[in-house]
Structures are given as C-alpha cells and as structure tokens.
Amino acid sequence: MLIIESVLLLRQHIRRLRQEGKRIALVPTMGNLHDGHMKLVDEAKASADVVVVSIFVNPMQFDRVDDLARYPRTLQDDCEKLNKRHVDFVFAPTPAEVYPQGTEGQTYVDVPGLSTMLEGASRPGHFRGVSTIVSKLFNLVQPDVACFGEKDFQQLALIRKMVADMGYDIEIIGVPIVRAKDGLALSSRNGYLTADQRKIAPGLYKVLSAVAEKLAAGDRQLDEIIAIAEQELNEKGFRADDIQIRDADTLLELTDASQRAVILMAAWLGQARLIDNRIVTLAQ
C-alpha cells in the first residue's frame, strides 16, 4: 500500500494506471475509520482493479470551527486498517495541498435544492463543501466507480445528482448502513459518546424502527408520527434535532404517487449529533 500526500504524485500514479487500463475505485473518507468504512473498501475492491482511499478532514464542509478542530485525526491507525484490507493507495493530503489558496477564494460546486434542504438547512455551507471536495477528488483520481455509505442519505443523493448534472462517467455505489449488534449505526462521531451515552444511543434506531413500522402499516399521519418520535427520543435522553419523512427517490414531501419513503432522523446525545435513516416501501 502506498500513502500519497501530494497531488503531483497522485496524478503520476493515476496516469500510469490509466495507461495500463486499470479500473479504479475511490472511497472518499475523513478518516477515523470503522467497520462501516471497511464495508465501503470491500465493495470497492469487488468493483475495480485498484482501490484509492482518500483521508481528508475537509474544512469546507464544517459549519463550526470547534467541530472541525475536535474531529478525530487517526491517520496511522487508519492506514494500518487499510493495509490489512490490501488497499492499493491512500491519498492523505494536507489542507494546504488541497486548497493552496485557502478556502475563502476556492471555486466551489453547488447542487441547488439538495444542498440547502433538510440537513443542509441546519448546516449552511456543509453540502457545498461536500460537493466541492468530492468533485475535486473525482478530477484527481479519475475513478470508474466511487463508494459512499447510505447512512448519509442526503449526501449520497447529492453526489448522484452532481455526477448526473456534471457528466461524470463514474458509477456511484451506495453501500448499506453497518450497525453494531445493538442497532446503532456506525459513525466516527460515536467516539464522542461517554460510556453511559453509548448505552442510550441504540434508542435512536428503536425510535426509527417504530416510525418505519407505522409507515409500512399504512399510517400517513406524518405530523403525529414525527411528534411522537420526537417525544420518545427526548424521553430516552436524546435532544431531538430533526425528523423528516420524505420520498426516498426525490427527497421531496410524500405524495400519493410515492412508492418509497425515507425516514431521516437526527438527534443530539451529549456532544454527538447522531443521524440514521430507514427506507420503507409504501403500500399502494
């Protein structure tokens, strides 16, 4: 496994791989890797000849300076995990390498609608930062396929739209959520939880599942369903942040024509903002 820190060296290797006709897969990450990331790597390995994992804590997608400062940096441990998975390349640049002129004057990629709705409404600039860095990585790595987790459902939808709108010839693979045995979705931010909070955390998935059962049974009283879910979260020790029930294919509000719903749930538990989602097939 080769660890690359410079754009110049990355381009040299990508050029060689292209000349050799290799199929390239990209797994973009911010590091602090867990089993969910390893599932992305496994999917990438099954889909290509060469796997490139990027590790970059992207300052453009953080709406709070303190959140950026405390995000875990575990590069050595991450590389050890990736080496055991037989990843070919790790691209781990510094912010100065990615944004030589800083982020203020950086050209950006914005996906209208999807970047400012739902999660984007509460985190201004977040999705613009995501689409910009992903677009930049696509240009640098030139992958044939890229793997993203379905836990960040809106992010995945945004990337798919960006790829379609910008004409990228890249297959986007959404990889299902990986959960702990107690149901908690794996996330780098789970590390912010205290031992007591970790015991409470699976309650998010329990509330999510209860909402899913109601929808699957034909209940369409969405405001009431959401209000009950918020109350249940708060009673369990969370601070409910946002619960949305949307069309899984458009992320717009449900209509009579909607075939699938996605439940998007976010709640604070101590210093950790936990997110999760479930897709429900609607009875027609």
From Swiss-Prot:
Belongs to the pantothenate synthetase family. One of its GO terms (biological process) is pantothenate biosynthetic process. Beta-alanine binds at residue 61. It comes from Klebsiella pneumoniae subsp. pneumoniae (strain ATCC 700721 / MGH 78578). Homodimer. Catalyzes the condensation of pantoate with beta-alanine in an ATP-dependent reaction via a pantoyl-adenylate intermediate. The active site is at residue 37. NCBIfam families: panC. The reaction proceeds by a bi uni uni bi ping pong mechanism. This is Pantothenate synthetase. Its EC number is 6.3.2.1. InterPro entries: Pantoate_ligase, Pantoate_ligase_C, Rossmann-like_a/b/a_fold.
